[in-house]
């Protein structure tokens, strides 16, 4: 995009680094070269290399553009002292106590108490606690796709609650339901011999002939970005590579075992030589592996406890990069749902931890609904009916529908809180940390109550963002649609009172807002005061109000402080398309001080004169 990447980013803004593509996103040589792209990733590229050289020779790409790209890449390499290092340094990971403390604090500070009718913080008289939910023992601490990293350790809610609460409390655990989008990995502890699968790479289509090499791999998701076939499969050097995964598997429970396979290319699954799944003869488009994968196919096999079975998956790479998936779900030893309901009935208090995982919230595909995956809503409703002393913990990275919200007495959104998630959660549940997180987005009551709903998914995978300026809380204001929980919402274990708003307009249209916030409760807490600006003559295509400033202040019980939020001229401006500048319109502006987009406590009005073409962008 020449205007954005060359004219604005590089020329107007003076950016002297280089522009890199998303992985596999560069599809055209000339358009990318002339549009400002400097580095194609991953390498070796498809649109650079020989294709770029041909475009230069044909006069379709100016050689001066290539010189600029090379200069930018070398400049960054020099700045990062790349030329002073020889070879690759070994990867390092630093795990220090100060890092752990910071991670724990950040996780706790980000948790948002959505609703609390007296259940939190937890009381000290609990005798029997039920920890329920698919995210209790194995929470989702990080997003899927490229956001997935390998932490030094992980602290999950169930283990943290058991280790931190009074040992006299009788604690039970029940999963409640499965939530996987794709079946989980084969249990390595039930494989005979070395850990994981024996993976054999063959040159050609015939399995068993022309073996290149073999290795053992653990897991169920095998792709080039995590080492699988990285040095083996090359369409240039070896256009026909086949891979066989095999292991001896001894189930620890009898019954129907469900298997699942898919990948970029063709794959099939055999158990004791009998084909169970054919995702080879005919494949359909899927959404995994950045939508390059075939659609999932599943098969059921009746396996007997204690007997050894030979599992084989055959795979032929055909597509963008090598990737294949194998999952297996053994039968449950008991009714997970009924186990959870029984545990809830027998407990004084329930901590119910639900949510999503890296299959549901990841890059490469959209969420098409706001419901919690699988049977979690059903589980929540049943547990709430069994025990009103239930705290619902939502371990998800984005908004979800909550059809059970009226029946819940306490709900907290924890997001994907990192490796210290469990400890941070217990800190907040017990009151060691008073929750102070605020919602960075509006939570709708249902998916239809979202700005983009009427435009999604568009036509032929092309969607216009026709909500334009009315995104998030701006759309809810203008449409008069109430959100389930508004932007900026978040409760505390204490209460705050606002008073005495004073507004002053000083030079260059700078505005100061001063007001008093008092902690009227019994415990220390932090309040996030938000300042919104509303122009009296805004059109229907514009937001009614916009957040322009905020301040977070920690207050002791009964303490009050004067809070000051300063707004610059830029905070009252709009972008004029005709003059291509930030301008202020003459008229009345209302300043609204509140604790969320829907909870406004103080108001004041000021008058500003028109200012044209003199405003600098915020830095």
Give residue ranges: language-model regions:
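Short secondary-structure boundary segments
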Residues: 44
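Mobile "lid/hinge" segments at catalytic clefts and subdomain interfaces of large enzymes
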Residues: 27, 33-41
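N-terminal active-site wall of soluble small-molecule enzyme domains
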Residues: 2-3
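Short coil/turn segments at secondary-structure boundaries
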Residues: 65-69, 84-91, 122-124, 442
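C-terminal non-catalytic regions of proteins with extracellular/luminal or membrane-system context
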Residues: 6-7, 12-14, 20-29, 47-49, ...
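Long, well-ordered, tryptophan-enriched scaffold segments
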Residues: 36, 49-84
């Amino acid at each position: 995009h020449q205007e954005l990447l060359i004219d604005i980013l590089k020329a107007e803004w003076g950016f002297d680094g280089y522009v890199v593509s998303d992985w596999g996103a560069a599809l055209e040589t000339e358009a990318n070269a002339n549009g400002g792209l400097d580095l194609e990733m991953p390498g070796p590229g498809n649109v650079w290399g020989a294709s770029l050289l041909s475009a230069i020779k044909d006069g379709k790409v100016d050689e001066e553009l290539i010189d600029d790209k090379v200069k930018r890449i070398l400049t960054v390499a020099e700045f990062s002292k790349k030329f002073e290092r020889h070879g690759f340094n070994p990867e390092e990971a630093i795990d220090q106590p100060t890092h752990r403390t910071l991670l724990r604090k950040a996780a706790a500070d980000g948790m948002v108490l959505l609703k609390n009718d007296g259940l939190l913080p937890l009381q000290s008289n609990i005798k029997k606690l039920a920890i329920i939910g698919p995210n209790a023992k194995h929470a989702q601490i990080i997003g899927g796709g490229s956001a997935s990293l390998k932490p030094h350790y992980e602290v999950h809610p169930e283990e943290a609650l058991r280790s931190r609460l009074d040992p006299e409390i009788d604690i039970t655990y029940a999963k409640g339901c499965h939530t996987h989008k794709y079946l989980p990995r084969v249990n390595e502890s039930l494989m005979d011999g070395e850990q994981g699968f024996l993976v054999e790479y063959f040159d050609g289509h015939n399995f068993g002939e022309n073996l290149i090499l073999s290795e053992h791999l653990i897991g169920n998701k095998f792709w080039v970005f995590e080492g699988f076939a990285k040095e083996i499969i090359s369409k240039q050097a070896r256009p026909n590579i086949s891979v066989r995964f095999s292991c001896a598997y001894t189930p620890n429970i009898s019954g129907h075992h469900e298997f699942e396979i898919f990948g970029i290319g063709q794959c099939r699954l055999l158990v004791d030589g009998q084909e169970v799944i054919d995702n080879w003869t005919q494949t359909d488009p899927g959404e995994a592996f950045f939508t390059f994968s075939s659609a999932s196919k599943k098969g059921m096999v009746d396996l007997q406890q204690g007997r050894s079975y030979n599992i084989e998956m055959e795979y032929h790479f055909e597509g963008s990069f090598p990737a294949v998936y194998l999952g297996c779900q053994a039968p449950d030893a008991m009714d997970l749902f009924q186990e959870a309901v029984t545990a809830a009935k027998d407990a004084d208090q329930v901590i119910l931890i639900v949510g999503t995982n890296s299959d549901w919230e990841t890059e490469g595909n959209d969420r098409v609904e706001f419901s919690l995956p699988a049977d979690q809503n059903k589980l929540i409703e049943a547990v709430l009916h069994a025990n009103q002393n239930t705290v619902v913990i939502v371990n998800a990275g984005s908004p979800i529908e909550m059809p059970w919200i009226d029946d819940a007495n306490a709900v907290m959104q924890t997001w994907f809180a990192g490796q210290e998630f469990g400890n941070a959660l217990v800190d907040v549940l017990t009151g060691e940390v008073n929750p102070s997180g605020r919602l960075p987005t509006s939570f709708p009551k249902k998916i239809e109550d979202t700005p983009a709903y009427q435009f999604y998914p568009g036509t032929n995978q092309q969607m216009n963002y026709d909500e334009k300026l009315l995104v998030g809380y701006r759309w809810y204001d203008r449409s008069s649609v109430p959100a389930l929980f508004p932007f900026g919402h978040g409760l505390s274990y204490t209460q705050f009172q606002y008073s005495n708003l004073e507004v002053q307009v000083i030079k260059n249209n700078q505005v100061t807002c001063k007001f008093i916030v008092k902690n009227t409760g019994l415990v220390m807490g932090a309040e996030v005061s938000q300042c919104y600006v509303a122009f009296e003559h805004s059109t229907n295509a514009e937001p009614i109000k916009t957040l322009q400033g905020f301040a977070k202040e920690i207050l002791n019980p009964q303490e009050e402080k004067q809070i000051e939020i300063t707004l610059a001229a830029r905070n009252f401006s709009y972008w004029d398309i005709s003059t291509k500048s930030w301008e202020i319109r003459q008229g009345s502006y209302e300043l609204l001080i509140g604790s969320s987009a829907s909870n406004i406590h103080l108001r004041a009005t000021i008058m500003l004169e028109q200012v044209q073409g003199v405003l600098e962008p915020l830095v």
